[in-house]
Amino acid sequence: MGKVRAVCISEKRGTQKKNIESAVFVENWGIEGDAHAGNWHRQISLLSEETIAAFKARGAEVTDGAFGENLVVSGYDFTKFPIGTRFTCKDVVLELTQIGKECHHGCEIFQKMGECIMPTNGVFAKVLHGGKISVGAVSYTHLRAH
């Protein structure tokens, strides 16, 4: 079980996301108003609160959304879940589609810290069923049988 700690969006690509506390998740699209929403496999990005806290402990000065993550969730190590894992949070159902990503060359965090956690700890999902998620909501996992 996990708990949502931040819900973040950015209206333009290339800008840091901001915690808006609550958002509408649209089936096969992403978060309403987020620049990265669309009909593709990386509609939602997720990071664990624990991973962010460990990075901050090494001196990183980051806020929710700094890594481009849409959801910050406590209680999960997202890298331990296989592709296809489903997360439910109220009515919303997300399916894990990708683990990690290549950091872009202009990554401010990488330039300051010499590393970034998104390439190894960030995960991506698509929205299978829409609804609203707010900070404090509880999330459950469902491993898909292969």
Locate the predicted segments by residue.
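Electropositive, beta-rich accessory/interaction domains or terminal extensions
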Residues: 1-101, 132
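Conserved small/polar residues in nucleotide/adenosyl-binding loops
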Residues: 141-146
